[in-house]
Amino acid sequence: MDVSLVPADTTEDVRARGARAPRRVAVLPVGSYEQHGPYLPLATDTLVACAIVSEIAAAYPVHPLPPVTIGCSHEHADWPGTVSISSTTLHAVVRDTADSLRRSGVDALVVVNGHGGNYVLGNVVQEATARGERMALFPAAEDWEEARERAGVTTSLLTDMHAGEIETSILLHAHPELVRPGYEAADFVADDRRHLLSLGMSAYTDSGVIGRPSLGSAEKGKELLASLADSFGAYFSVLTAADVPRQGGERG
């Protein structure tokens, strides 16, 4: 069993780990099954989400869950191998998972998203919060930006859109055997993607790559994951607090 993807916990492991925290917190990796060019696997987003969860689970007493491996990848439909579910289905899967966790005594859930097209996850968390539930979506754009800076990632988040420096780096660190030769010459930049939702990815790239995978390295991948694990600490504190603290700036 590959425990980097499917946790090998027993029920007693979960019970003991939960006793070390004020509240039990589960982390759910959500990815996709979509093209990532000729050099990265269809499961890249799921592998990235699971790598983040593994790093988090090594640092915090959380309950790691098996991944949701198919997401909302409709913009990649022109490439063979891509599979999608509807946003309604993904919404239901996450909400049902949270409901089931609460019945077994785990009352907080962090959704760790590995695919930018899973827009509905933000709505799931908004609605759960409005119902008084404890849920978070991770990583935020700010967390990725901090990780980029710490790891020395050259490409901006705008340019590094798909199968680029960040994803290649994380896979070179976590699953180097899955990165095929040729990524070093696969760079393709298309920063102006304003009609992406209307036209799909194929309007902007023939290869499926938008970014600079040639700049990826295992060392950058290691630092990206370490930074994200550090950023997770604030989310863990919020979800395990007796009362969810208010966040905000000063009054002007």
Predicted regions and their residues:
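Extended, histidine- and acidic-residue-enriched regions that form the cofactor-binding/catalytic faces
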Residues: 1-108, 114-252
